[in-house]
Amino acid sequence: MHTIIELDNQTTLNVDIEALEKIAQSLTNREIELIITDNENIQELNREYRDRDNPTDVLSFPLETPFTEQSVFDIPLGTIVISADFVRERAKTYGHTEQDELKLLFIHGLLHLLGYDHETDEGEMRQKEREIIEEFGLPSSLIIRND
């Protein structure tokens, strides 16, 4: 299996990188940087890049490139930043594992890197999330939350 996720885990959260790789490879063959951080650091990024001064669950930073055929040039897709604090809190709240919550946030971030935007696409991104959640046998509590 070709590794496409470059992991920078700045926390103690356990990360099932093989499971995330399978999800990523079902959607792209381009490299993805995945940063797992805490609420303090993600709040700083949220403030700097989105003008929102609060922590959030996941941020995506697509790599802008002038090429039309990006995959030909092996250019990375971008960076996904996930808050381990949110992963732990939401897993507890919704009654599923931290790994399942991490997978959901990874899927959400990856779809943003691929150009989906739930704020403007009339449900297209949510539908794609649902399909991936079902394809990988993730708990229905992840789907319900996204409706």
Swiss-Prot record:
Molecular function in Gene Ontology: metalloendopeptidase activity; RNA endonuclease activity; zinc ion binding
Binding site for Zn(2+): H108, H112, H118
EC number: 3.1.-.-
Gene3D superfamilies, per the entry: Metalloproteases ('zincins'), catalytic domain
Cofactor(s) demanded: Zn(2+)
Keywords recorded for this protein, A-Z: Cytoplasm, Endonuclease, Hydrolase, Metal-binding, Nuclease, Ribosome biogenesis, rRNA processing, Zinc
Cofactor comment text: Binds 1 zinc ion.
Entry keyword Repressor: no
Matches recorded under SUPFAM superfamilies: Metalloproteases ('zincins'), catalytic domain (SSF55486)
Single biological process term from Gene Ontology: rRNA processing
Family stated for the protein in its record: Belongs to the endoribonuclease YbeY family.
Protein name (Swiss-Prot/TrEMBL): Endoribonuclease YbeY
Source species: Sulfurovum sp. (strain NBC37-1)
Organism placement in taxonomy: Bacteria, Pseudomonadati, Campylobacterota, Epsilonproteobacteria, Campylobacterales
